[in-house]
Structures are given as structure tokens and as C-alpha cells.
Amino acid sequence: MSMAYEEYMRQVVLPMRQELTDAGFKELTTAEAVEDYIADAEGTTLVFINSVCGCAAGLARPAAIYSLQHDHTPDHLVTVFAGQDKEATAAMRSKFPDYPPSSPSMALLKGTEVVHFIPREDIEGAEPEAIVRNLALAYNEHCQK
């Protein structure tokens, strides 16, 4: 792959990254960053597997961000970007062995255990409000302080 293409793609996805980081998500861009985060994971974490696809832009990212207005929310927010930060994404997906790779997707962790997972097939074609409700129900069950 040419360096010009890689730089172009970095620029194209920048707003897609910023949408989440502006909402408080911490980007994990290397496998080492993922491993370090998981090693110290406490409380609840919403993991967002980001993507360039339309359902990420029109459904998943807005729903994840809006869900943070709920009364109960995760203690931590992290994101990896599928197709861009490949090693980080592979490292994070390795923490969800019971779920096939899917992007966009969201996992709610309690410590290092996946307690709720929303795969792409539950995002595509869904109304954003339905995704927010899905997350809110998981937050109610797992994120009460």
C-alpha cells in the first residue's frame, strides 16, 4: 500500500475518530494500548469497534454517543478502529472470543468480562432509538453505581 494512500485514509477517517473522542472515548490505536487497558480494566467499559461504513456513521456512533445521556453509564469509554488500527482491533476482538468479528459493534465489559454485545447485524437497519434503548437496558443492568 502506498504511503500516499495511507495518509489519505488517515485524513478521511479523522472526523469518524473525532466524533467518538469528542464524546469522551479514549482511542486505543495499538495492540499494546489494548493489552495495557485490559490489564488494568476495572468497573464497566463500553468498547466501540469503529468503522467507515454507513451504519457506523448514521446509526452506531450517534446511538453510542446519545446513550451516554442515560442515568446509568459505563465508567470508561474506549474505541478501536477496524480497518485502520488493525493490530489494536485484533487485540480487542481477541477479548471477545464468543463473538464473531463485527464492525461496527459495541461491547459492554464488566472488568474484562463481556456482559453485553451489539454486533453489526443488530445495528444495520435498526432505528438509532432502538440501539440507544438496547444500550440503556444494558447500562441499567450493569452500570449502576
Swiss-Prot record:
Q: Per the UniProt entry, what are the Gene Ontology biological process annotations, in alphabetical order?
A: cell redox homeostasis
Q: Name one Pfam family in it.
A: Disulph_isomer
- The residue ranges crossing the membrane are none
The record's annotation in InterPro entries points to:
BrxB/BrxA
Protein family (similarity comment)? Belongs to the bacilliredoxin family.
Q: By its UniProt entry, which NCBIfam families does this protein fall under?
A: YphP_YqiW (TIGR04191)
What's this protein's name?
A: Bacilliredoxin ABC2045
- Source organism per entry reads Shouchella clausii (strain KSM-K16)
